[in-house]
Amino acid sequence: MTIKRIFMVLVVLFISVWASSGGAAQSLTLILDWFPNVDHLPIYVARHQGFFAEEELEIKIISPSATSDALKLAASGHVDIAISYQPQTIIAAARGLEMVVFGRLIEHPLTTLLFLEGQGIETPKDLEGKRIGYTVPGLMDVLLDAFAKLNNIQHYKAINVGFSIVQSLTAGKVDAVMGPFKTYETVVMDHRGYKVGYFELEKWGIPDYDELIFITGKNTMNKYQATMAAFRRVIDRAIAHVRQNPENALKDYFEQVPEADRRTETDAFKLTLPYYATRQRLDVKRWQQFANFALKYGLIDKRVDVASIIWTVDQ
């Protein structure tokens, strides 16, 4: 065989190998913070519109068994990406969990302290001596403690209600719950005929923060930086698409999540739309301000340098 012929054979083999490997999508498992709802709509829209596929990503979306599962599973590398909360990641970082925050889904607080109207609750001080539920252990109970300190609530009983927000309130098991979103559980309660009130945390002393964020384990990030950068690009693109085409985006969501309650999710989407992240890059200064607040009010017991957990690369 001549040298020229050998060269041509090698070229053909190289092209064949390149073609067979280049089309393989990177498979990622994403765990939600909660059951699927319109907070997560841009992710489902991205999948429906083929935005992930265009970046050669294949996303498997799963729901947590318990409200505190997502962060731990991502930090340990058992899933690739988790949706978490800014306060939760700062608390976890102070406790030594290794993770990287690399994107945002909801850029301002949605969390409230929710209660039924007609219970004599007008100001936070009226919660003195009450039974207050919380949704996410290790997060909402800690935020509740800070809220109580800020608003001079000296005595209350904290009760873990997990996912059972509506049932706990309507059955009288608790007088209020820390953790419901002003864009979602308020809608659910209204549709079930209950009038509710709520305290927005940022209006009662808690600093502004990113409600829903994307995190991954430190080892996962070290291995898949380009993949995570691609994921961020997709989320940015999906949110822009949702803002420009809200009605079609909602239709895409219902096709992806056919079991969703259409009435509730439609009304909740209208309230949620303004809160989707305007960009993926995280504000280190804003994050540090919250971390400093967390140390001052006992959410954490040692200082966290947020630059050590935030991925600020623009890609």
Walk through the language-model features, giving the residues of each:
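Bacterial N-terminal signal peptides
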Residues: 8-18
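Short, glycine-/small- and polar/acidic-enriched structural segments
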Residues: 27-162, 166-171, 175-183, 198, ...
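Pocket-lining segment of extracytoplasmic ligand-binding domains
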Residues: 87, 163-256
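Bacterial N-terminal signal peptides that target proteins for export
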Residues: 1-8
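Conserved C-terminal helix/tail region of periplasmic/extracytoplasmic solute-binding proteins
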Residues: 292-315
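Sec/Tat signal peptide C-region and signal peptidase I cleavage site
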Residues: 18-25
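Secondary-structure end/capping motifs
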Residues: 222-299
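A bilobed periplasmic-binding-protein/Venus flytrap-type ligand-binding module shared by bacterial periplasmic
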Residues: 45, 111-121, 210-227, 275
